[in-house]
Amino acid sequence: MADGVTLVDSTGLHSFSSSPSLSTSSSSLTAVALSLATSASAVTASYSISHLPPPPLPPVPTTMAGWIGWVFSFFFQVIPSVLYWVITFSTITLPTWLFTLFSMSLTFTMNFTTLLLIVLAMVSTISWFIRYRFLNMYSRLPPEPQRKEPQVDLFPDVQEGDSKPGLANYLDEFLSAIKVFGYLERPVFHELTRTMQTRKLIAGETLMLEEEKGFCLVVDGLVQIFVKSMRDGKSDTDEELHHLGAESSDEEHHIDGKQGYQLLTEVKNGASMSSLFSILSLFTEDIQLRENESSGSSSSSIALRAARVPNSIPTSPRGVMDSPSLGFQDHSDDTSNMITNGDLPSVPPLHLGESHTPPSGDQHHQQHHESRKHSSRKRRKSVHPDIVARAMVDTTIAIIPASAFRRLTRVYPRATAHIVQVILTRLQRVTFATAHSYLGLSNEVLGIEKQMTKFTTYDLPNNMRGAALDRLKDKFIKERDRLGSEEVTKGIALHNPSAGRRRRSSSFLRKDAALQVKMMTPRRAATVVTPESAPAEHDTYGVSPGDLLSTIQSSRFGPRYEQPPAKLQSPLAEKENTHFRLPAMQARHTFRRQDTMDEDALFRECILDCIMKGIGLTSSTRDALRKSSHSGDASPKLLSYDSRRQKAIFTNNAFGFIDPYEGSGDGETESLMSMSVTSAGGTSPVINLREELRNDIEIVYFPKGSVLVEQGERHPGLYYVIDGFLDVGVPIVEKGEDLVGVSKPAASKESFPTLKRTTTANSIGAGGTAANDSRRRKQSRKSLYLIKPGGIQGYVGAVASYRSYTDVVAKTDVYVGFLPRASLERIAERYPIALLTLAKRLTSILPRLLLHIDFALEWLQVNAGQVIYHQGDESDAIYLVLNGRLRSVLESPGNKLAVIGEYGQGESVGELEVMTESTRPATLHAIRDTELAKFPRSLFNSLAQEHPGITIQVSKLIAQRMRDLVERPVTEKGVERSNAGGVQTATSTVNLRTVGILPVTAGVPVVEFGNRLLHALHQVGVTNGVTSLNQAAILNHLGRHAFSKMGKLKLSQYLADLEEKYGMVLYIADTNVSSPWTQTCITQADCILLVGLAESSPSIGEYERFLLGMKTTARKELVLLHSERYCPPGLTRRWLKNRVWINGGHHHIQMAFRLTAEPSHPETKRFGTVLKQRVQVLQAEIQKYTSRRIRQTPLYSAQSPFKGDFHRLARRLCGRAVGLVLGGGGARGIAHVGVIKALEEAGIPVDIIGGTSIGSFIGALYARDADVVPMYGRAKKFAGRMGSMWRFALDLTYPTVSYTTGHEFNRGIFKTFGDSQIEDFWLEFYCNTTNISKSRPEYHSSGYVWRYVRASMSLAGLIPPICDEGSMLLDGGYIDNLTVDHMKGLGADVIFAVDVGSIDDNTPQVYGDSLSGFWSVFNRWNPFSSCPNPPTLSEIQARLAYVSSIDNLERAKNIPGCLYMRPPIDGYGTLEFGKFDEIYQVGYAFGKQFLEKLKTEGSLPLPEETEEKKKLQRTMAPRRASI
């Protein structure tokens, strides 16, 4: 019976027979039962044995003996029991259990159906696991929601004023008022304010501003400024104003009743009551308008003055010949006596009338008043006539008298010139720009330049005409015949052999001049002028042919160099021929070589001579200013200066101007206060400008029709017309002339920063489009006036650095002398009389209308973050941005802030609410320190009554503004509702003038980055050029005290001038984080670029903490520098996660850089250090070839110099970005791949990509690597997946929501993009979707790529909507299939829009008022039916879904800058992905043909030549074709 278990299979496996039968005898069954019982008992026995509890431990003893016994007991009793239990369990119990388990026999019975179901269940389980656990990785990605844009920074406005004590408040108001003078050094400030007076005006008291000879400002109170209406007729306003002043009660009633007076403006605390023109008149009272203005009476006055020379001054003919034609000179000799005693001379009133004998005592003042009254009949009585001020409340005003300005002109002439330069600049940027571009007063502004020609026209001498001019023309004619017509249009310049010597820096010239002064010291002893030798010397000077003016002046009386010198003895003749003298020996030497002088050089010298006289460098002004310097200071040192200058002036000063005007050798770094001190000894090195300027003169020939100056550009220099005529005119807009008869002032294509309306279009036309529009505009122009031979073109613009309001075209073949602007700047810097003369001429010819506008316009300085007005405030003024940047913020319920717009230099804000007298719709605050022109509503009302044309002009501007609001893209209207985050208004990227480059942390190569960006901006072509600033450049220009408390004023003025001069300024923060320069870079920036190394730690850097502490509201953008053109997935998100203040987007830039900067003082290298560095180099080389990143580098890159990352960033900053918009259309979107390849081959860069549906897929592929090759491969692979019917069939589901589950579609997109995020794309990218939960469009620029591309491609019914933060997203084409509006809002200037959507069937339907479905089916299959097939239910639903999309598409086609492309792909269906190659070739062929057509038409947006190249072509390129 022991063998009872043999019935079990020997292998121990279970038998699965279908019907086993076991037949045994009863004895055998008994034996089996007995054996089972035996086994059971054995098991029970073993179980009981193995589960016996271990023996109990002996009790714990309490004594030492007990402890020892207890230990022995433990070892001999417990341990053997444990060992016995372990052995029993392992040898008996465990084998018994195993034997019993394997001895059991089980039997299962099943049929085939059951077996098949089991197999299907197993397969289903495995497929479910693979599909939803392995292939479903895209649904298990960590959640990365779209990045929310930070709230607008709007810091609370600091209220200033009443909280300060009286004296501090008084000083603040006074300082804010005199800011109009620009930077004032301490001695200049004291000189200007030491004679200041204050007056108290009671409420209702009137003040005749015509009688107040000084600068008036309101310290405390409120003053209204009234102007006499011109409608009452022009009468003797002087007497009327005197009468009004005598009867204040009548005046009050007169003004209140609006009888003949109109309110101009209201002046509050800290504002000036004087206009800019009145300030200029105070500085320029002693300046002569034209040289020969008073020459008729000069001889008598010279003789009388010569008889009055006091004995204390050496009687030399110099004194006789220096006598001016100004009445001011009558008192200079008297005041020189006072200098010896140290007394301050009394400053008499000055005038520009005829010369007269100086009276004495009270008779002097009476005669002087009569003289002024007599001379005033020839010109305006006052610079501010018919202006009356009335105090509304008790008011305190401060008056700086005119005598302070006259004294300042004498003591600190260079400081005076600086102030005049500042005022002239503000005059152009405030008054002229407002009148010309905003109010449409072009005739008045352009008339100033026309009237200026009467002061600047000087004919060439007779001997330079006739045969000499014919010989000059012959040279040009021969050269013109030799060159082609294409080269001649650039102009032909006469060869100047001395031109090579002029290209030297000013520092070298200063050194040469100083060396020349030292070497000429022995010669001076021989040329000292004594009273005895003076007549002979002057004879020599009178006939010196090397003089700048002697040749011209002598030519008026015939060829003077042929006459004997003895004939030049009359004082008048001597005066006429002593304008600019050379040193005596040099004069004699040049006289001897007169006969051999080159004719071309003589032409240049004569042209320079006429230009000098034209800009005011004449003998009269020179002598007057020199004489005035005698009384310029009370210092006794100037007595020796007076005696020495009689000797030194001949050999040390080529022009004979007063020494305080010369200054020190380095005028850039010396302070203004040191000018008169440095020159007191007469030993300052003076550069002989004469030779320099003569070499700078170019004689250029321009054929008929050549453009010398384009409208809006900065004047290249002065053009002196030798022969021919120049036509000065303005372009006429093709849409029709304005009612005021001028060109459209708010034209968005004008390149100069004039006042214009804020539009979504950039102020600068990009590339070929701007050039093409410019060419079209030039076809129709309005001629204003002609410049005849002897005239100067560009006087006002070139001397004062204005931009041209006109263009200048050669009316005939014209020969001109050209003096570059740089030479004029040198003249203005060394001889301030040029600026003063310009200011005097401007004040003399100013129209009355411009004067009143200038009176009412208020110049404001606003600090960064300061609120100009709040939402809901009363609208009292229009604000024009002169310098800086403003932001308009809408405060919605719930304290949510939304940016409405940003306004840069030249733009205006507030017209709509001012004209409609409504409250402010939004809060306006300054992004950075800003200069504004405040245009009060009272001025507009006054101008509207006098000049209705102004009302028409502003009304047209408001109408255009309203039209822009109505036609604003849907995308911008829904900015605050969209969760796209990255959406910005179109104005936020337009008209950026300053860009700050700030490192995230120390060690970032910002200097190299800034230099590369500067180079890219130069190549892209920023209008008016671009420059960069770092701390070294500032210190070199302003000295080491540039960042001191006083130096900041000078620094701010210098930076404002740079921003006016250049189109863009880069501020590079190359100093440590706490330096003043870093703070300046932050406060001056419209946009801040935070530059970081992508591979370094993304933690917050110290510069960012400093930036946050500054509380700046400027735009902030993140720039990540990559050593290779690859961005790992998720890297950008880590950088942006903690930087909520990045509100302007981010950029990926490839730039090779050194991670560790080289030490300035490298230590001596040891052997170990060298070995370690060598190992690191080898590791880097090996890693370069073994890294996975090498496989991500681009495979294909077009050979285009403008496709670099820095060029892309440059285009974004200057508003010339190129956008690519790809529409949806299913398989037809494969044509996008071909179009993009055609763009690549044409060299057209793409900066921003936006797509819808299949366009978002193709666009994302291109934006990821900015490469065509990987895009082509991935797109073809995806098309293969989509073309598989098996995948579509396997994805079918019960159509409750859609026909498919969407899994295969998701898989195809996810396999293409992986876990990449939109932020990691190399190019900026967005896609649009339709949010059916909130019924709005959404634009996505962050988050996982596959999700939003999948959402943008989700066709309703075919694929289920994708869920995003609780909302359901569908295909973006339902609302907008071609997102040109949104692309324009992102700042793209040129947009390529590729439309591949299906064309709607617009066949007319005539099936009647009711329709039978059976007839519809029959009609569809009836080939003989003439009735069109009615649309099916699905077609009607589809058309209903795309209703709004069609409307947006039609509007997109008409957006300026949009190049609409429609490839011929109508024959392909939406799901025909299998025809990839065919559709691709169609798109490629169409793209090449379309771009070739644009290139032929000249409208292809390729980068055009830069502004510098244009200037070079116009002025310097002729040198290549020189004779």
Swiss-Prot record:
Belongs to the NTE family. A nucleoside 3',5'-cyclic phosphate 1 binds at residues 681-800. Keywords: Endoplasmic reticulum, Hydrolase, Lipid degradation, Lipid metabolism, Membrane, Repeat, Transmembrane, Transmembrane helix. A nucleoside 3',5'-cyclic phosphate 2 binds at residues 841-961. A motif (DGA/G) lies at residues 1371-1373. It is found in: Endoplasmic reticulum membrane. Its main location: endoplasmic reticulum. The keyword Hydrolase applies. GO terms for molecular function: lysophospholipase activity. A motif (GXSXG) lies at residues 1251-1255. Residues 88-109 are lumenal. Its EC number is 3.1.1.5. Residues 309-384, 524-545, 1502-1523 are annotated as: Disordered. InterPro entries: Acyl_Trfase/lysoPLipase, cNMP-bd_dom, cNMP-bd_dom_sf, LysoPLipase_patatin_CS, NTE, NTE1_P-loop_dom, PNPLA_dom, RmlC-like_jellyroll. The chain crosses the membrane at residues 67-87, 110-130. Residues 1-66, 131-1523 are cytoplasmic. This is Lysophospholipase nte1. Residues 1220-1384 form the PNPLA domain. Inhibited by organophosphorus esters. One of its GO terms (biological process) is regulation of phospholipid biosynthetic process. It is a multi-pass membrane protein. It comes from Neosartorya fischeri (strain ATCC 1020 / DSM 3700 / CBS 544.65 / FGSC A1164 / JCM 1740 / NRRL 181 / WB 181) (Aspergillus fischerianus). A motif (GXGXXG) lies at residues 1224-1229. One of its GO terms (cellular component) is endoplasmic reticulum membrane. It catalyses: a 1-acyl-sn-glycero-3-phosphocholine + H2O = sn-glycerol 3-phosphocholine + a fatty acid + H(+). Intracellular phospholipase B that catalyzes the double deacylation of phosphatidylcholine (PC) to glycerophosphocholine (GroPCho). Plays an important role in membrane lipid homeostasis. Responsible for the rapid PC turnover in response to inositol, elevated temperatures, or when choline is present in the growth medium. Residues 370-382 have a biased composition (Basic residues).
